[in-house]
């Protein structure tokens, strides 16, 4: 029986983040959406225009008997730039900022220790925010499993 837990990460464009995590052994499901803002049921347009305060996130449901929260955090750190505020690559805006949203005190502690450890390897200061999870609003259907639907788009991680 699966020991299902949830993790939520903001690490730039949620399409790429979802594609990364959905291939990981122990991940049960992924869903992209919005978290951390002040508008109920925001649209992609509202988020992109900076009108909602939300972050693009990937919600990861995983079996903690197969993969740990620490393992997921390692993937998080290694697959985006946590030192650049409000930007990942070509994507610019608050919605692309680096965030870890936690559900339990245990997740918060693990995330904080992970950030401290990661900072030792970085020349620049990590700007990743670690915040208590708030309401998750699923993104529109066309954003879900985006790269899987566009099977001619392949990402290399």
Curated annotation (Swiss-Prot):
The active site is at 13. Its EC number is 1.8.4.11. The keyword Transmembrane helix does not apply. Signal peptide: none annotated. It comes from the Archaea. One of its GO terms (molecular function) is peptide-methionine (S)-S-oxide reductase activity. Keywords: Oxidoreductase. InterPro entries: Met_Sox_Rdtase_MsrA_dom, Met_Sox_Rdtase_MsrA_sf. It catalyses: L-methionyl-[protein] + [thioredoxin]-disulfide + H2O = L-methionyl-(S)-S-oxide-[protein] + [thioredoxin]-dithiol; [thioredoxin]-disulfide + L-methionine + H2O = L-methionine (S)-S-oxide + [thioredoxin]-dithiol. SUPFAM superfamilies: Peptide methionine sulfoxide reductase (SSF55068). Has an important function as a repair enzyme for proteins that have been inactivated by oxidation. Catalyzes the reversible oxidation-reduction of methionine sulfoxide in proteins to methionine. Belongs to the MsrA Met sulfoxide reductase family. This is Peptide methionine sulfoxide reductase MsrA. It comes from Methanococcus maripaludis (strain C7 / ATCC BAA-1331).
